[in-house]
Curated annotation (Swiss-Prot):
TM regions (residue ranges): 44-71
A UniProt-annotated Pfam family: COX6A
Similarity-based family: Belongs to the cytochrome c oxidase subunit 6A family.
Organism of derivation: Saccharomyces cerevisiae (strain ATCC 204508 / S288c)
Compartments in which it is found: Mitochondrion inner membrane
Name used for this protein in its record: Cytochrome c oxidase subunit 13, mitochondrial
InterPro entries: Cyt_c_oxidase_su6a (IPR001349), Cyt_c_oxidase_su6a_CS (IPR018507), Cyt_c_oxidase_su6a_sf (IPR036418)
Keywords, comma-separated and alphabetical: Membrane, Mitochondrion, Mitochondrion inner membrane, Oxidoreductase, Transit peptide, Transmembrane, Transmembrane helix
SUPFAM superfamilies for the chain: Mitochondrial cytochrome c oxidase subunit VIa (SSF81411)
Stretch forming the transit peptide: 1-9
Segments on the Mitochondrial matrix side according to the record's topology features: 10-43
Pathway assigned to this chain's UniProt record: Energy metabolism; oxidative phosphorylation
Membrane topology: Single-pass membrane protein
Gene behind the chain: COX13
Function: Component of the cytochrome c oxidase, the last enzyme in the mitochondrial electron transport chain which drives oxidative phosphorylation. The respiratory chain contains 3 multisubunit complexes succinate dehydrogenase (complex II, CII), ubiquinol-cytochrome c oxidoreductase (cytochrome b-c1 complex, complex III, CIII) and cytochrome c oxidase (complex IV, CIV), that cooperate to transfer electrons derived from NADH and succinate to molecular oxygen, creating an electrochemical gradient over the inner membrane that drives transmembrane transport and the ATP synthase.
Length: 129
């Protein structure tokens, strides 16, 4: 039915409208494309395997060594913080005028501690003058 309508109105169509859009298939070009596709797939697989090996043999040991180093550094920090807990206020350096200025109390807690106050690290030092 379509062909009948197309032939009837063929005079109003452009001259190439009823011809096939593509010529006959090129078997050699198709084979080259298939080989290129297979080579790309093999390259992708090899590259993926290479990055897996790099991740396992380079990245994981580097992370492990960094973790060991971090453990010892943080262990020293913990010992230092434990020591600072027992230091009396009189041995701490004096606060400067610009430190711990409160123009009005904070609306949380006791009004004197900042939002990110950490009682292990932060402390108010009271000196007798």
């Amino acid at each position: 039915m379509f062909r009948q309508c197309a032939k009837r109105y063929a005079s109003s169509l452009p001259p190439n409208a009823l011809k096939p859009a593509f010529g006959p298939p090129d078997k050699v070009a198709a084979q080259k494309f298939k080989e290129s596709l297979m080579a790309t797939e093999k390259h992708a697989k090899d590259t993926s395997n290479m990055w897996v090996k790099i991740s396992v043999w380079v990245a994981l040991p580097a992370i492990a060594l960094t973790a060991v180093n971090t453990y010892f550094v943080e262990k020293e920090h913990a010992e230092h913080r434990e020591h600072l807990k027992h230091v009396p206020d009189s041995e701490w350096p004096r606060d400067y005028e610009f430190m711990n200025i409160r123009s009005k109390p904070f609306f949380w807690g006791d009004g004197d501690k900042t939002l990110f106050w950490n009682p292990v690290v932060n402390r108010h030092i009271e000196h007798d003058d």
